Amino acid sequence: MKRIVAVTLLLALFVTVGFPATVDTISVFSKKMAKEIKTVVIKPQSYDRKNTFPVLYLLHGHSGRYDSWVKDAPHIKDLADDYGMMIVCPDGGSDSWYWDSPVDSTFRYETFVSRELIAWIDRQYKTIPSREGRAITGLSMGGHGGLYLAFRNQDIFGACGSMSGGVDIRPFPNNWNMAARIGAQPEHPANWENYTVMNQLHLLTPNTLRIIIDCGTEDFFFQVNKRLHEELLYRNIPHDFISRPGAHNWVYWNNAVKYQMLFFHDFFEMAKKK
């Protein structure tokens, strides 16, 4: 009798606790760049083959890697469990800025993330294969990427965000190897206008995308984020803007990602009801 009770309790514990989020490290081939690209995929503990799940594409910053988020902010696995969403973290190269480079045909990261990667993930995993089931955000270079890719691919993403994002590249012509990707500013001034988030705002219409922007007041990107917020207000584009004391570091991003994931969870839940 005692043995039966013990087994019953163990089974109850197994069912109640379940398994935590799982982390897959995969390689996705990019035809446009003719290479394999490492990507982390986090599946929530509720993941199974019977249901479909929303996906957050979470981008790393300059000099980062596909595993930066899961190593430096490991609690995102718990957030994936809490909200029942998948998280996909692709390798964006150390300095791609998630552009299709106009001066280097070997860099096609906009196409990779917004087309090739998403198509691959939708084939291999039980995703919600529509813009209502996709969001994208990131930190620093990845914050630029999150907004830039979503603004330009609104048929793919339904929500987007940025944490400490480089949302206007023009004040920083000599930084982060951007000149290697879009040409030096004096020789290619049009590229610096065309490849910045600030000049994609004409693509937006009210209530098409859910948008969240977050930047610390001690961050060197704070002023350009504040300016983006003001431009969105001027254009009557609804968005959430968060600023609080903080710098350009993982202490800030570990906190910011919690608010971003709650924001995207709310978006996914509202989309289910439509």
Please annotate each region the language model reported:
Residues 7-16:
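Bacterial N-terminal signal peptides
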